[in-house]
């Protein structure tokens, strides 16, 4: 029986995903759904060759209990019981420090038990990967700690924040690893798990299917969000708001323009 779903060939799948890079949300979500990849990544970025990853929960995973309102690109469970949330950000259009604080707090609240003492709250590591130098100090890697202003002493509150970027090139292993996030193909003997995972997702049918499935989810979500914004624009325009006022509420200009054109026949009647 024909399900109505279009079947595409291996070649067509390769063509569909060929331009995706690790820094792209849709691709990283699939890329990170692999313990070996995440373990190698964190060993390098956290500079700990003995680090062990025992489990990974990605945004689309059935194991994800945190909800869509909390964007967790890859939540890794480490061998020592700590959790490490890896986030990828291409656009410099938000308050990144507050985003990190919000997501870390959400993880802590979700995983805490009623009546649990605060000393029992699990430590959380956040690795924030960006396509830009967030602190503009020409470093590829930043560690952000809580400190006492008067003494300069570091305070251990259980939150460890590491910011790493693809913009700065300083010749280190971390910098070389981050350069791979901008490539469409990765073939580097220094990063075997990264190389193997990229090859599987770009050239093996099972991996290609996984990428295409997530791409379809992103495309469907974009359609739904666009429709919701279009309906919002129509409602606001019908209530007497000007197009510029609608744009100020966060509706993109192109959607407001479409809504305005759709309203014209009604206004002319």
Explain the meaning of each model-derived region.
Residues 1-160, 170-172:
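Accessory alpha/beta interaction modules
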Residues 2-22, 26, 77, 84-89, ...:
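Short, charged alpha-helical interaction segments and adjacent helix-coil junctions
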Residues 163:
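Catalytic-site signature of metal-activated, phosphate-bearing donor transferases
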